[in-house]
């Protein structure tokens, strides 16, 4: 069954499964915030660096399997596999979207 993800969220997951940090950053608003592993990354440049650093640290793939909530604030569950401690794991991605860009993303 295909999930009905907002286009920018679909693009985020596609980009996150590559080594292209520019593609990841392009999904976000200029002043966006990402919270991952209890750290905040503010703005596109920091998000680009986060995307790059994440790929240098681990190899992983995220596969969304559930989405809830309104289209401007989707909550997505994804199965993540890779070479990180605790592999595999199901994570929750909480998005806030503004004007077809990701304004906030919290991963946990």
Residue ranges and their predicted role:
Residues 48-92:
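Surface-exposed, charged secondary-structure patches
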Residues 32-42:
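A short gly/proline-enriched turn/hairpin at secondary-structure junctions
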Residues 1-18, 22, 26:
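Short, low-complexity N-terminal intrinsically disordered segments enriched in polar/charged residues
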Residues 41-49:
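Short beta-edge strand/loop motif at the mouth of beta-sheet-based domains
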Residues 90-108:
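Short beta-strand edge/turn micro-motifs at domain boundaries
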């Amino acid at each position: 069954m295909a999930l009905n993800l907002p286009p920018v969220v679909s693009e985020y997951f596609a980009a996150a499964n590559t080594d292209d940090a520019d593609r990841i950053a392009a999904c976000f608003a200029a002043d966006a915030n990402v919270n991952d592993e209890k750290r905040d990354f503010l703005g596109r440049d920091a998000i680009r660096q986060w995307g790059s650093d994440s790929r240098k640290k681990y190899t992983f793939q995220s596969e969304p399997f559930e989405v809830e909530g309104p289209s401007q604030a989707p909550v997505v569950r994804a199965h993540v596999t890779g070479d990180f401690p605790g592999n595999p794991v199901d994570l929750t991605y909480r998005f806030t979207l503004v004007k077809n860009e990701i304004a906030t993303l919290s991963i946990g």
